[in-house]
């Protein structure tokens, strides 16, 4: 229980970065959809993608390079420390995927497409988590538990990017044309 709690504290600390990017971009996207400024939407999206990519690599590096020190903020040496460190190494790849998933969910909300936004959120935080928590521990033991969220986020990113390419850009173009 202690290891899960520590991992979740680290997770929620870092996810705040991605939430901030999504929350900051959403009103800019919404406003510019309404005003028909497609170029500003593209610019905001491009800057968001770049910021997410850089943040994701940095957060992954921090979690792996300084993970021990971060864990020591919560617990001293011992079994819990070693369990948490082993878990963090398996869990940390989540930081490569989660930023884009959170952003694209917020992006579709900003476009007024709540269905796709909810689909992305449901896949990454419920549907695929339940699916992988049922499958991965049977295949990989305890390691599968720690890999559940990274796997859910990794699969979701492919679906979210597909939805962005299929509906995100065309939705904006149609909305801007009809304005």
Q: At which residue positions do the language-model features occur?
A:
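Small-residue-enriched core segments of transmembrane alpha-helices in multipass membrane transport
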Residues: 9-10, 89, 122-131
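A short pocket-lining beta-strand/turn micro-motif at the edge of beta-sheets
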Residues: 23, 114-116, 126, 132, ...
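Transmembrane alpha-helical segments of integral membrane proteins
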Residues: 102, 128-137
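Short, function-defining helix-loop hinge/capping sites that tune catalysis or transport
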Residues: 17, 107, 121, 129-133, ...
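Interfacial/gating helices of multi-pass transporter permease domains
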Residues: 1-12, 79-85
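Small-residue-rich hydrophobic transmembrane alpha-helices
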Residues: 4-61, 65-67, 98-120
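Short alpha-helical transmembrane segments in multi-pass integral membrane proteins
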Residues: 29-94, 135-179
């Amino acid at each position: 229980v202690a290891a899960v709690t520590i991992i979740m504290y680290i997770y929620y600390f870092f996810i705040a970065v991605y939430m901030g990017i999504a929350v900051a971009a959403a009103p800019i996207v919404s406003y510019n959809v309404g005003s028909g400024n497609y170029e500003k939407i593209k610019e905001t999206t491009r800057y968001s993608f770049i910021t997410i990519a850089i943040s994701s690599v940095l957060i992954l590096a921090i979690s792996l390079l300084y993970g021990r020190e971060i864990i020591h903020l919560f617990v001293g040496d011992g079994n819990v420390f070693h369990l948490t460190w082993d878990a963090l190494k398996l869990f940390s790849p989540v930081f490569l995927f989660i930023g884009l998933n959170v952003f694209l969910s917020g992006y579709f909300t900003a476009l007024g497409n709540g269905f796709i936004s909810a689909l992305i959120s449901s896949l990454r935080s419920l549907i695929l988590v339940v699916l992988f928590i049922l499958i991965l521990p049977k295949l990989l033991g305890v390691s599968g538990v720690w890999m559940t969220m990274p796997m859910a986020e990794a699969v979701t990113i492919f679906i979210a990017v597909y939805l962005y390419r299929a509906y995100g850009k065309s939705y904006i173009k149609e909305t801007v044309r009809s304005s």
